[in-house]
Amino acid sequence: MITPTTRIDRFQARTSRGRRRLRSGRAVHLLDIENLTRSTRPTTLAVAEVMTLYRRVVPIGPMDQFVVAVNHGALVPVGIAFHGVQLLARSGPDGADQALAEAARGDRMDQRFDRVVIGSGDGYFADLACWLAECGVHVTVVSQRESLSRRLRAEVSAVITLEPPVAQVA
């Protein structure tokens, strides 16, 4: 028996295929820069140093996007350090974390990216990581070793540790 297709069925099939193509090979990096720099008021230099290390240890593709969140007090120095990123600002307890989580869900990153890299060890992101993984997104966490929450670690399949280079002894 042949099942009749409606316009809605054809549209849903087309958009579903389109979403898969849109996701293919793309990643988004959600960066809680305060957590990565270990400072609530990171300087432009501190952000640049952390990002140099980040780029050295984290695979970044040509189609990758970056979303960076900070509190309002750090907006200018962080904004100077970054170019071509989506910069979010929210103050208060977990303000930057909330801004990143809301952006991920609101912008439907589960449908737009194959891979999400969470640049933070904060346990606040455990629920987001769980949701993304349930949606079929590969989730990686990038964190300082001592800043990685056990709860967040339990929700992801991959962790990359940011370790500052050991100073050369002369």
Can you describe what each PLM-predicted range is?
Residues 72-170:
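Nuclease catalytic cores that cleave nucleic-acid phosphodiester bonds
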